[in-house]
UniProtKB/Swiss-Prot annotation:
Ubiquitous. Expression was highest in heart and low in lung. The lineage of its organism: Eukaryota, Metazoa, Chordata, Craniata, Vertebrata. A zinc finger (RING-type) spans 822-861. The modification N-acetylalanine is found at residue 2. This is Vacuolar protein sorting-associated protein 11 homolog. Belongs to the VPS11 family. SUPFAM superfamilies: ARM repeat (SSF48371), RING/U-box (SSF57850), WD40 repeat-like (SSF50978). It comes from Homo sapiens. It is a peripheral membrane protein. GO terms for cellular component: autophagosome; clathrin-coated vesicle; CORVET complex; early endosome; endocytic vesicle; endosome; endosome membrane; HOPS complex. It is found in: Endosome; Late endosome membrane; Lysosome membrane; Early endosome.
Length: 941
């Protein structure tokens, strides 16, 4: 009784009498009538109702006259005569439109079971598909209870003599059903219920003194004795899945719940129980105060009908009484259409309509019963948004009462639904750092925190100086356990001075840039930073060395240089003292790291020399920088021996062949540092012979001038002319060098004699004896050439006269063809044949095979073609001469015209490569004469 009195009572149901329908509009029972219909009468059922049930959209009643009545939602009562005497039991299936009834058709104890198919009709009444006697044997006994399995394969009937019969098979047909006695006992059976769990079917049997269960889906029907306490008629029920389909037995002292194999919890609801019913998670108990005891426990519902009876609706999960009211003489409690209906002995039907969830919650809120509201919302399957709203209101209530610890626990339950800033603002204003920390921790744990939340939580830890919590927060075992923005955490910890914690996060979560920033800028641990870079993958090691290389080079130059050497040759990340030497290495572009060595020339030289030795294919910038560095060292060195060594190194580098494509850059470097040997070497490699000559001339190195001419004069003959001009301007006695130059000029015929004389005329020390031998030899050669030319002219004139005579003879005299052999095949000439005026004759088939033109002699055609090409060239050159003279006269810039013609090669000497030596003279003949010569080869007929 004490436990029962502690349960709170609420009015979560609305009670009203069901009225008769005003029209056939299908209004729900218990609905409030419209205004103006106050005269509506309350619904009154026929007298003598003894049993009730519900399902399939109707309330079903049985009376003492043998009739069964149906009350659908339209409240249009209908019935039919089911038995001749009375109806004692009804069971309406919920999943099938099948009704099972027990009644009497004759006097005496002979109950009949009838199965009705409500979907089929027989003379306007439901079709009775099966009738059989309830008593299996010959001993008369009264039926006390009835239950049917929803699969229509089991039906159990309990009797007052303590026996239970089980009908197994299709209960709607006689031939498919088998009846047997399942249970025999000494106490009246007061309740039966089937429970289906997977493929196993249990039958609960309760009597006035005990509770037991059977497995009826097998063959042997094993029995389990559950308890030695029983209950009265209609005081047992089967719960829904919310209570795990437990069998409820309502005794006078307690209400017990049973599983098929054991007893479950019990509730101390005192009072003499009359009815037990289960409805949508609620336990409905109709009881009478124990102060008014009935004459018989088994037949108490029929005694003292004028007593007041209490109906309580219990919420067993949330442990409160959802509704409590008083009725006079309750016949039964039914559930249909989402409501409860209470039938009283006076024929009235009372509707108990459950309030909606929001209304119930508001009632609890008004009483500040938030815990109960939460439990209720969960049992009513309220969505997460609705629950979050309750948690928020509960938290606000606790916060207003000063219970900050309790409030934050409720706010934590709103995470994911309630905006975090709402909670954060409350605890920031109240300076409740501990509570705020708890909320933020959970926010991160659920991976719903942003960068601002992480910042705030870490600030809370630092203000509380709670290093243990801070370490617990950041030191997670795996990446999946991290519920915060790591980069934000690193920033906050760094700003707060928790460098070791920030380093831990940066290293474990691969935030390499932050790790190096803290090591280099805050802790100044350059060795550790360099070691860390050496462990990184190639791409990250490369990028971080470019970013932090200058700082590291400034503080630890040797170690930094060593790492750069490895990075640019064959880089493999170090893995805690070991490295995978078999894995293929990577290498960076060494040229990109040269700026890191600013102000560290010693390390730069070591790096560059290492790269040039280990990787000869290093970028050109490596060699350019190394050359510049060596030249700088050479220029600033004072020690002669060291300077000579540096000189050799620079020359060796220049001769390595790495500066062919960057000749100009290397030359500029050598000139900047006055490295003359390098300049001369590069001049020679670049074929800049003029510059070599000028260098030796500037330094008056006469022998070197002659040497340059001898070595490179074949490639650039103008060197000899420049040498002659150079020595001619010298006032010193340079006869030896002038003679050497003149000898070469004479041999190669590089200058006209007059120009040689004019050039040497500028030298006051040069006498006629210097050039006497040269002039004599030149005059002799010219005399010989003149004699040869005169002889050639006479010969050509005679040849011209002869040819003209032949032409005249061809024009004036007949031509006799006396050739006897073909000029192509040298065989005897036969008809048909082809003859030409030039004297050549051919077989016709030979001519057709070898001739390129029908009008030209195949034998003379090559020579004739040369002559024609020469004529065309002369005519073209004459036309160009006229055009050139015209443009020269009309142009304002004569020099540009001349330059344009030079660029087009107009003034180049015309030479036909196929011409024999005699062709040069032929080219001087008149064009008209040349055309006449071609007549020798015209075809004769």
């Amino acid at each position: 009784m004490a436990a029962y009195l502690q349960w709170r009572r609420f009015v979560f149901f609305d009670k009203e009498l069901v009225k008769e329908p005003l029209s056939n509009d299908g209004a729900a029972p218990g609905a409030t009538p419209a205004s103006g219909s106050a005269a509506s009468k309350f619904l009154c059922l026929p007298p003598g109702i003894t049993v009730c049930d519900s399902g399939r959209g109707s309330l079903v009643f049985g009376d003492m006259e043998g009739q069964i009545w149906f009350l659908p939602r339209s409240l249009q009562l209908t019935g039919f005569q089911a038995y001749k005497l009375r109806v004692t039991h009804l069971y309406q299936l919920k999943q099938h439109n099948i009704l099972a009834s027990v009644g009497e058709d004759e006097e005496g104890i002979n109950p009949l079971v009838k199965i009705w198919n409500l979907e089929k009709r027989d003379g306007g009444n439901p079709l009775c598909t099966r009738i059989f006697p309830a008593i299996p044997g010959t001993e008369p006994t009264v039926v006390s209870c009835l239950t049917v399995h929803e699969n229509l394969n089991f039906m159990a009937i309990g009797f007052t003599d303590g026996s239970v019969t089980l009908n197994k098979g299709d209960i709607t047909r006689d031939r498919h059903s088998k009846t047997q006695i399942l249970h025999k006992g000494n106490y009246p059976v007061t309740g039966l219920a089937f429970r289906q769990a997977g493929k196993t079917t249990h039958l609960f049997v309760v009597t006035t003194e005990n509770v037991q269960s059977y497995i009826v889906s097998g063959k042997d029907y094993p029995r389990v004795e559950l308890d030695t306490h029983g209950c009265g008629l209609r005081c047992s029920a089967l719960s829904d899945p919310s209570q795990d389909l437990q069998f409820i037995v309502a005794g006078d002292e307690c209400v017990y719940l049973y599983q098929p194999d054991e007893r479950g919890p019990c509730f101390a609801f005192e009072g003499h129980k009359l009815i037990a019913h289960w409805f949508r998670g609620y336990l409905i108990i109709v009881s009478r105060d124990r102060k008014v005891s009935p004459k018989s426990e088994f037949t108490s519902r029929d005694s003292q009908s004028s007593d007041k009876q209490i109906l309580n609706i219990y919420d067993l999960c949330n442990k409160f009484i959802a509704y409590s009211t008083v009725f006079e003489d309750v016949v039964d409690v039914l559930a249909e259409w989402g409501s409860l209906y209470v039938l009283t002995r006076d024929g009235r039907v009372h509707a108990l309509q459950e309030k909606d969830t929001q209304t119930k919650l508001e009632m609890l809120f008004k009483k500040n019963l938030f815990e109960m509201a939460i439990n209720l919302a969960k049992s009513q399957h309220l969505d997460s948004d609705g629950l979050a709203q309750i948690f928020m209101q509960y938290g606000d209530h606790l916060y207003s009462k000063g219970n900050h610890d309790g409030a934050v626990q409720q706010y934590i339950r709103t995470i994911g639904k309630l905006e975090p800033s709402y909670v954060i603002r409350k605890f920031l204003d109240a300076q409740r750092i501990h509570n705020l920390t708890a909320y933020l921790q959970t926010l991160h744990r659920q991976s719903l925190a942003n960068a601002d939340h992480t910042t705030l939580l870490l600030n809370c830890y630092t203000k509380l100086k709670d290093s243990s919590k801070l370490e617990e927060f950041i030191k997670k075992k795996s990446e999946s356990e991290v519920h915060f923005d790591v980069e934000t955490a690193i920033k906050v910890l760094r700003q707060a001075g928790y460098y070791s914690h920030a380093l831990y996060l940066a290293e474990n979560h691969a935030h390499h840039e932050w790790y190096l920033k803290i090591q280099l800028e805050d802790i100044k641990n350059y060795q550790e930073a360099l070691r860390y870079i050496g462990k990184l993958p190639f791409e990250q090691a490369e990028s971080n060395m470019k970013r932090y290389g200058k700082i590291l080079m400034h503080h630890i130059p040797e170690q930094t240089t060593q790492l750069l050497k490895g990075l640019c040759t064959d880089y493999r990340p170090s893995l805690e003292g070991r490295s995978d030497r078999e894995a293929p290495g990577c290498r960076a572009n060494s040229e990109e790291f040269i700026p890191i060595f600013a102000n560290n020339p010693r390390e730069l030289k070591a790096f560059l020399e290492h790269m040039s030795e280990v990787q000869p294919d290093s970028p050109q910038g490596i060699y350019d920088t190394l050359l510049e560095l060596r030249l700088q060292n050479w220029a600033h060195e004072k020690d002669p021996q060291v300077k000579e060594k540096l000189h050799a190194e620079a020359i060796s580098l220049l001769k390595s062949g790495r500066f062919c494509d960057v000749f100009d850059k290397a030359l500029v470097l050598c000139q900047m540092h006055d490295f003359q040997d390098g300049v001369l070497y590069l001049y020679e490699q670049g074929k800049l012979f003029q510059q070599i000559m000028h260098y030796h001339m500037q330094h008056e190195q006469y022998r070197q001038v002659i040497s340059v001419c001898e070595r490179h004069g074949e490639q650039d003959p103008s060197l000899w002319e420049q040498a002659l001009s150079y020595f001619a301007r010298k006032e010193e006695d340079c006869k030896e060098y002038v003679a050497a130059v003149l000898k070469h000029i004479e041999n190669k015929n590089l200058m006209p004699p007059l120009l040689v004389v004019q050039t040497l005329a500028h030298n006051s020390t040069a006498t006629l004896s210097v050039i006497r031998d040269y002039l004599v030899q030149k005059l002799q050669k010219q005399s010989q050439q003149i004699a040869q030319d005169e002889l050639r002219v006479r010969r050509y004139r005679e040849e011209t006269t002869r040819i003209r005579q032949e032409i005249q003879e061809l024009k004036a005299s007949p031509k006799i063809f006396q050739k006897t052999k073909c000029s192509i095949c040298n065989s005897a000439l036969e008809l048909p044949s082809v003859h030409f005026l030039c004297g050549h004759s051919f077989h016709q088939h030979c001519f057709e095979s070898y001739s390129e033109s029908d009008a030209d002699c195949p034998t003379c055609l090559p020579e004739n073609r040369k002559v024609m090409d020469m004529i065309r060239a002369q005519e073209q050159k004459r036309d160009l001469h006229d055009q050139f003279q015209h443009q020269l006269r009309c142009s304002n810039d004569s020099f540009s015209v001349i330059a344009d013609y030079f660029g087009r090669g107009v003034f180049n000497k015309l030479t036909l490569l196929t011409d024999p030596p005699t062709a040069r003279l032929t080219s001087s003949l008149e064009a008209g004469l040349q055309r006449d010569l071609l007549m020798h080869s015209r075809r004769g007929t």
